[in-house]
């Protein structure tokens, strides 16, 4: 079926990913680069609505934020990313372009893990905490701050009569892994994302009526129970 997969440990070896596993699929054959103001996929020349994205078998509307600079799932939660450009299972719906599946990572129970980051576009943080030898919880949040910088600039005189596009995005993830018994695992995963693009005019600048604000957001809550029956077979509910 011509599937292409990448594991999280391979990401740092690929150019242009900036440590984001989902950005790696742009290097796969048949993939088009994400355009500014679109977080959608371009697989083998198909329209974005002809492809689909799934996180742990739950479909989401977009893989990337509108800026195209980052995906909607933070890297610490990603175990693997797979692109299937054709011949995929009917359980993925009526997509004709391609399917991207993201598998989330089992949280470690050995120690506390975490980080915080700040760059030119956004700020975010992640923390993973073991609650016991069998239970671990992880949480992450990220938000861009270009709109805040823009507000400060406007408060100090703005940029004359300029009309500028100001993108804003955010996302969050909250995950609980519980090994209820040997070979049995309960996973609760809540995640969501939001994007907003707004045109702002300073001074006497007038907005073109065709320049409209663009909003998009989604939220998902998944509950999964998995039983490893042996010989490589599992039951998932």
Give the residues covered by each predicted segment.
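Short strand-turn segments of transmembrane beta-barrel domains in outer membranes
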Residues: 68-71, 79-89, 98-129, 139-143, ...
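Structural signature of outer-membrane beta-barrel domains
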Residues: 48, 58-60, 105, 121, ...
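Outer-membrane beta-barrel architecture
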Residues: 93, 97, 111-115, 136, ...
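Periplasmic N-terminal accessory/gating domains of Gram-negative outer-membrane beta-barrel systems
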Residues: 1-89, 99, 103-106
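Outer-membrane beta-barrel translocator domains and adjoining extracellular loop/strand segments
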Residues: 68, 150-156, 190-193, 198-207
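Transmembrane beta-barrel wall of Gram-negative outer-membrane proteins
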Residues: 119-143, 160-196, 213-234
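Transmembrane beta-barrel architecture of outer-membrane proteins
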Residues: 20, 26, 38, 68, ...
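Extracellular loop and loop/strand-boundary signature of outer-membrane beta-barrel proteins
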Residues: 65, 111-113, 156-163, 205-212, ...
């Amino acid at each position: 079926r011509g599937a292409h997969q990448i594991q999280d440990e391979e990401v740092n070896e690929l150019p242009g990913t900036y440590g984001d596993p989902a950005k790696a699929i742009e290097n796969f054959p048949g993939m088009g680069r994400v355009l500014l103001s679109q977080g959608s996929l371009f697989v083998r020349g198909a329209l974005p609505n002809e492809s689909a994205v799934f996180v742990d078998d739950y479909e989401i509307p977009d893989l990337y934020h509108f800026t195209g600079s980052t995906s909607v799932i933070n890297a610490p939660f990603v175990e693997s990313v797979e692109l299937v450009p054709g011949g995929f299972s009917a359980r993925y719906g009526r997509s004709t372009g391609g399917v991207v599946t993201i598998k989330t990572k089992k949280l470690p129970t050995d120690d506390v893990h975490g980080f915080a980051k700040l760059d030119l576009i956004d700020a975010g943080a992640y923390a993973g905490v073991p609650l016991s030898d069998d239970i671990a919880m992880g949480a992450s949040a990220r938000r861009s701050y270009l709109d805040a910088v823009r507000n400060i600039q406007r408060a100090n005189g703005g940029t004359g009569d300029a009309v500028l596009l100001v993108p804003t995005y955010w996302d969050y993830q909250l995950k609980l892994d519980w090994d209820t018994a040997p070979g049995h695992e309960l996973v609760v995963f809540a995640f969501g994302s939001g994007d907003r693009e707004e045109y702002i005019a300073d001074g006497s600048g007038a907005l073109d009526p065709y320049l409209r604000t663009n909003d998009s957001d989604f939220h998902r809550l998944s509950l999964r129970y998995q039983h490893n029956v042996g010989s490589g077979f599992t039951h998932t509910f």
